[in-house]
Amino acid sequence: MKFRVLVLATAGLSALLCACSSAPGRPTAGDTPIVPSEITDFNVLYGQNCAGCHGSDGKGGAAIALADPVYLAIADDTVLRHATADGISGTSMPAFAQSAGGMLTDKQIDVIVQGIRQRWAQSDILRDANPPSYSSSEPGDPSRGSLAYAQFCSSCHGAGGRGGQKAGSIVDGSFLALLNDQELRTIVIVGRPDLGAPDWRGNVPGKPMSPQDVSDVVAWLASQRAKFPGQPYSTAGKSTGEVR
């Protein structure tokens, strides 16, 4: 009799424990939140940190398209990693690495860089193109750049870069204040295909821009940048500092 009672008690306790483990509302293993620093899914990391500026599918955003094989062909992993980890000085691109004040670990930075290349790069896209180099240590000449601009760019952006029927102004103070010289160079070389802007080969049919043309146009654009960008405020009624 005692044995039977013991068996029944044990069975009842087991049933109770099983019921508790599957009670409605009890969190499952899949419900456990992931610590942000442990997220290693490219889609999640890109969506949370990159899509806002570069577009949800790598194009169509305010910043340069990452889903551009031409851009990825001239910008190597060192360039991508440095930009992602440390940001780009003189632009709106922030630093994302924890070592630079951001929120992402080194591993997460690597996931983003590798994911961008695996998803959007095409290894042979510039096989026979001989593009201008991503960066240049030789400064361009603004005077020559004005002539090169007129030849290669004015048909879309208008005389003096102030905007035309096909494209807007590229000498706008706010625009130039958001881009450093390297970003200007990158755009001149790879264009903005997501916005209809051609790369260095497509401005004049059959006549690609030379490396010197690229450097000179960048120098001319940079020379249009205001030293202290911003709205000019009226001085009417402004205090002279005199005590009255």
Positions of the model-derived regions?
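Gly/Gly-Pro-rich "capping" loops immediately C-terminal to redox-active cysteine motifs
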Residues: T32, P36-I39, N43, G55, ...
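C-terminal motif of bacterial Sec signal peptides marking the signal peptidase cleavage site
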Residues: L16-A19
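Flexible coil segments in periplasmic/lumen-exposed cytochrome c-class electron-transfer proteins
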Residues: P24-T32, P36, T40, V44-G47, ...
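Bacterial N-terminal signal peptides that target proteins for export
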Residues: M1-T10
